[in-house]
């Protein structure tokens, strides 16, 4: 089957931003103007196409990354609309991993918000080229050039306007395109009647000034263009487009556009810019992976290369399990068998679909560069690689942050017990930041996630989708433990009970691992002192012991264990004996490695009238907060601080009373840090008292 669109005419893009910048509305307009939907859906009416879960439509926020295909100017555009709420940061993370380009949407009034910085960092982590759409130009207080400057200052990006608004706030009537040097005037409310016109006289000087700056900025990044610019003093429209595209692909330039998606102004020009400036799959670096022999290899974006794809999202719905994949190379056909190289398991591809939000179009194959979904995969979870059985490779996976908050959950009736475990299994398969565990002391089921809203939505889904009635406990902070020094540990398990005994013996070296590594295991056994078949069980025993640390029973993270020695018995040794010996050695070593308690630190930004600045800072300091920055602009103060999550419960109520209801704040996870000794002692003694 031939391709619908050649690879150079495919764009895999994400639309990302902070809450309320208007991402979903922008996506809706893109779908309307490109012909996917024939009626405009509004977020506040609960009718947006990409907000397809019941909770999204009720709350007017996007929770999951919905993938949609559309076309514009003979190009296939695959769009992922990502959530702006920090509790759903994994959705942004997983979409950034599989995209080739991003439209970052900013509010023309609010400008750069804390969540914008998070999204920008995530795009940086995966080196995703991007462009900016400054939305909501129709709102009171909209200031296009001020937002452009904020992007330069706060995000350290070489942002450059390639458009200017004609009028602002209620008088937004059109847009000047600095590249084509033309004005586009909107003649009807639907944004379908657009007049191409000369630039209005009163804006000619401003447009000329910005166009000259744009030509200079573009020429600086390209030797060929700088010669033309120095020789002729200007660049043609085609030369400008070529230069902007090169700048975007090399991460040297971020073009900034403007408009109002809600008022139907500027969206078609955004689509034009996606086609003109954002990369095709063949414009970005080939995906890297590791071969079975441990060597690195790359897979080019080519239908003729061996098949490889990354599963970036798993979803359960009434029709079964849906696994979203990004095709990196080769062709995936319906009915074929493939290899999950991450889990070393064979999978059958029963059906393939391309999605238009909650509508599906069945296809016979997916090709390099496509975003699609597979039905019928049994063992594949988020971050797994799918590939040819003859050409195995494991692709780079996703960065998955540690959860920061947990609650106990128990079924209301015995009949709900089985339904609860099925629901929790399905939800944790979908969302790697959602963890399920059992509290050893109370035997309660504990669920952990990225924030209160995250857990609230998941509990809501249990009720709606799985019909589980459950009681939920009060939120608890997800502490962690780690080690600060190195040591040796030894575990010898020897039991003689009548006939056959049990014998396992291991010696390990323990040291702190890099942050984010979790549990790292290295085997340095030589001469067969521990046979190969017992190394896995010994490692598993240590890994399981990590789940409950030595200080207060919290999971132990960022620990490197090297197996250096041991002994075995020809008759009495078994996998179970070595698993127990591994656990004993781990416990022995940890106690000597200066274990410490870690707590989640949150990046908090508070906005309030500047009269309350002193009270806000004083209150944050009393919560063990470290103020990292503050500014006052137009009578509004902004304070950035890092505060332990444990101190932030009930903060919204306190802030309201402190600022007479005029203060707002945003909060997102920053990192784990060591708990001060006096606070740690109280937490440890409380936990030991409960055990």
UniProtKB/Swiss-Prot annotation:
Signal peptide limits: none
SMART domains tied to this protein: EFG_C, EFG_IV
GO molecular function: GTP binding; GTPase activity; translation elongation factor activity
Binding-site positions, GTP: 17-24, 81-85, 135-138
InterPro entries linked to this entry: EFG_II (IPR041095), EFG_III (IPR009022), EFG_III/V (IPR035647), EFG_IV (IPR047872), EFG_V (IPR035649), EFG_V-like (IPR000640), EFTu-like_2 (IPR004161), G_TR_CS (IPR031157)
PROSITE patterns: G_TR_1, G_TR_2
Domain of life: Bacteria
Name of the encoding gene: fusA
Keywords (A to Z) from UniProt: Cytoplasm, Elongation factor, GTP-binding, Nucleotide-binding, Protein biosynthesis
Name the UniProt record assigns to this protein: Elongation factor G
Localisation per UniProt entry: Cytoplasm
Function: Catalyzes the GTP-dependent ribosomal translocation step during translation elongation. During this step, the ribosome changes from the pre-translocational (PRE) to the post-translocational (POST) state as the newly formed A-site-bound peptidyl-tRNA and P-site-bound deacylated tRNA move to the P and E sites, respectively. Catalyzes the coordinated movement of the two tRNA molecules, the mRNA and conformational changes in the ribosome.
Pfam families (UniProt xref): EFG_C (PF00679), EFG_III (PF14492), EFG_IV (PF03764), GTP_EFTU (PF00009), GTP_EFTU_D2 (PF03144)
Similarity remark: Belongs to the TRAFAC class translation factor GTPase superfamily. Classic translation factor GTPase family. EF-G/EF-2 subfamily.
Membrane-traversing stretches: none
GO BP annotations listed: ribosome disassembly
Matching PANTHER family: RIBOSOME-RELEASING FACTOR 2, MITOCHONDRIAL (PTHR43261:SF1), TRANSLATION ELONGATION FACTOR G-RELATED (PTHR43261)
Residues in tr-type G domain copies: 8-282
Gene Ontology, cellular component aspect: cytoplasm
